[in-house]
């Protein structure tokens, strides 16, 4: 093994160890904050960390970004009605317990609120992107300054899905409110889908990865206690109790995304059941969108066009070919997770094959909650012109398996990324 490979390997072990320690706290976190069990459906939670000071003499001049759309309604009516059908049947037979009637009432309210809004960005999703935009603006005011005649051009692009377009609009709206002098362009066009939405491997792998994820659900979920707490003995028999348990969990998970915590019913589950449900959803996301040894290679590789665009656009700005202050991109979890995994960020680098080990080293709510984002902040030395890059995942420093962090030398970062894109 050459020296560079050895350094990268050792760095990867450090990243994996750090991720393991962080993920091991999941059960404690869920006990204190049951809404975090929602994983990929967890609404965005700003959790600031201690920041390393910017090296002396360096000033921010450009930001590159990829963000998932904000909190939304469930994408289909089936995700609301699936757990309600057996509850309704039992209610008609007067075979629900008091807890069962309460859960049904809350579920019906969530379903009614979502009617005609499936997949839509919620108001909470709008506010998430406005808040992220404001923190970005206030953290790096030099980037968005128009003082002394400086031009600030923000280029934004999104996928063709309305919730992504509206997330882009909310983000830009807040930036313009903070500085009306910003010049912004916003596009949603098929022209950019080759890198904003390039994940064909997931469709090809879908049946196999979903089958493995379903086998995990069958092994880990034990619905007997839950079912007995909701239904009396007179209730019609459930066709698939495990599916019912998971569907019910999916329904309560979305309450936070539409600003209706009063309609959540996490208390219907024990802490052990919530942990099992979180672990099941976590494994599903890992196998279908993440860097698993079994399915991850083509999924992670699908993010290469996006990373190439990020690096090439940054090079054009650094070399003076383009006068951009920020490049903002808006898409989905199925694109952001492979990007984070391709970069081998500290929260998403773990590559394992054993399902039982996933929960100890990978937590989807830390990788891609609603409005998840990866930011690349570029700094230039005022005297020498040297450029450094800081990488943030969900507004926290992302440790990469290369030297020089958290303010990575541009050439080191560029060579690292180009290597990832060429493999």
Where are each of the predicted segments found?
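Bacterial N-terminal signal peptides that target proteins for export
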Residues: 1-10
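N-terminal signal peptide c-region/cleavage motif recognized by signal peptidases
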Residues: 18-22
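Signature for phosphate-centric chemistry
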Residues: 24-155, 159-327, 331-423
